[in-house]
C-alpha cells in the first residue's frame, strides 16, 4: 500500500490520474451545488429567529470549513515535501493555496453579509472573525512568498514553513467560540450532540459542503496538471504529451 502511494507521488503518474479524475469531480461539484442550493434556498424552512436571512449559512459554513481544511492539507503536503523531498508535494501545496484563499475570502464576505442584519455592523473584533482574517493573510503570504522566489525548490521549502507554522491558526479558529466569549455563534454541526436545525437545513448544508469538497479536488487536480507541465517541461514524457506536442506544432 505504501509503495502504491509513492507510485502516485511521481508527477508523471499523478498527471494521468488527475486528468481522469478532474472532469468527473467537476461534474459532481456542479450537481451537488445545484442540489444544495435547491434544498437550502427553496425547500428548507425559514429560521424561527433569523427568518430568511439565515439562508446565507448554506454558503458561509461550507466555505468556512473548506478554508480551514485546505490549509491543513497544505500543511500536510508541506511536511511530506520537507520529509521525503517529493516534487509533487510542492505542486500540491501551491495548487491548494489559491482555492483556500478564495474560500477564506468568501467566508469573510458572507460572514459580513450575515453579520450586518444580525449584529448591526459589517465587522466586529471577534476572535473567530479575526483568526479567519489571519488565515486569509496566511494564504496571501504563502502565494506572495512562493511567487517572489525564482528558484522553485527554494520557494517550495520557504512556502512549506509558512504552511506548517500557520497551521496553528486553524484550531484557534475552530475553538475560538469555546475559548473566548464571542459574538459568533457556536458550531452549526457537532459530532457530539444531536443537530439543532431542521433536517432540510442540515441536508442543504451537507450537500453544499460536499460540493465544495468536489470542487476543490477538481480544481486542484486541474491546477496540478498545469504545474506539472510547467515544471517537468524539459522531460521526454512531457514533450511527448499530445497537448504539449500539439501546441508546439
What are these regions (language model features)?
Residues 2-249:
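Polytopic transmembrane helical bundles with strong interfacial aromatic enrichment
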